[in-house]
Amino acid sequence: MDKLKEFWQESKADYESKHNTPFLTDYDKSLPYFEKMQELLLDMQKEDKNNVDVACLLASVRMELRDSYDTCAKLLLDFLNENKNCLSDNDKARIYTNIGYYIGFDSSTPEYLLKAENLSSPYAETYKGLGLYYFSEYERDNGDKNLKIAIKYFEKAKTISKDYVNHFNYAASLYENKKYQEAKIIFENLLAKYPHRMRLILALSYCEIFLGNKEKAAFYLSQVKCGQDENYSLSTDEISEYQVYDSYYVLDEYDTFLDNCKDIICNYYTDDWEHYYYTLWIKNKKDEFYTLVNSTVSKLEESIKEAEIDEEYDSPDEKEEYIKSYKEDLVKYRAMIKDIEDGCKKPEITLNLYPEYECFLIDCLRHKFMD
C-alpha cells in the first residue's frame, strides 16, 4: 500500500502542477494517471495474485476508467472464486461489500451486502450500504418495515465509524420514524461539531415543528440559507427553497409562506400544489388564485389539443393513452380547485429528511488516498 500511496501523491502533485486545478477534476486529463495506476496494480498482482488490496483497488481503477459496474463486480467475483480457500472472513466481507456497491440497488435484495453481514463484517460501509438500500425501499413503498430495518443498519454503521455521515443518516431515519426527540439530540450534537451547517439547522427546525415548539422551529428556520452550503459540500448540504418554505406552511405562517413562494413559484410544477392554492384561498388572495387557476387550465387544455393533433406516436394506442392521461390530469386539477373553493380542511404535507446517499465502496480510490 505504501507504494500505491507514493504513486498517488506523485500523480496528484504532477497533475496539479501541470493543470493548475485540483486532482482528478477533469476526466480526460485524469485518464493517463488511472491508466498508469492500472499498470502498476496489474504488475503487483502478477507478483502476488492473492493480494486483496490489489484486487479491490484494481476494480476501483476500472470503475474510474469507466468500465461497467458489472465488469468491476465480475473482477471481484472471479478473484473471490479463485482464492476463497485462502481468504479470511473479513477479506470476503470486504469483497462482498465492494461487489454490493457495484451491483447497486437494482436487485430485489442486497445479496452481497447481506453476505458480508453474515460474515460479521467489521466495515461500516457494509451497514451503511444496507441502511441506504432499505431506506430507498422505504422511500419507494413508504413502509415502516423497511424504515426500521434501515434504522438498525445505520445505527450499526455509526457504532463502527463515528463520522458525520453515519450519525446524520441514523438521525434522519429516526426523524422519518417520528422519533423526533432522539433525532433532535443527535442533530444538536452534530451542530456543535459542525457549526452553521444549514442541513443540520433545517433538520432541527423540522424536529421542533413536530415536537410542538413553534418558536424554536421559527428561530432555526430564520437561519437557513437555501442553495449549496458555503462551508460544506455533501449532496444533503444543498437545500431547496421549498424545503424551507413548506415549513412555514406547516407552522401556519401563511404570509411568510406566500411571500417566500412568490419569487420561486415559476420554477416549479405547481399543478398539484394543493397547499399553495389552499393558502391563497384562505388568505383571500383571490386574484392570484384565479390567475394561476386559469393559466393552469389553459395549459392543460392546450396539452390535450396538442396530443390530439400530434402524429409523433409509435401507435394509436400510445396516442390515446397520452390523451387520456392529460384529460385525467385536468379532471383531477378541477376537482382539487373545487374542494378548496368549497372550504376543504388544510391539506397535509410532509417534511422529509433523507440520508446522504454517498459512496460506500470500501476501496474507493478517491476516498482511500485523498482523505
What are these model-predicted stretches?
Residues 53, 90-94, 125, 163-166, ...:
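Start-of-helix register in tetratricopeptide repeats
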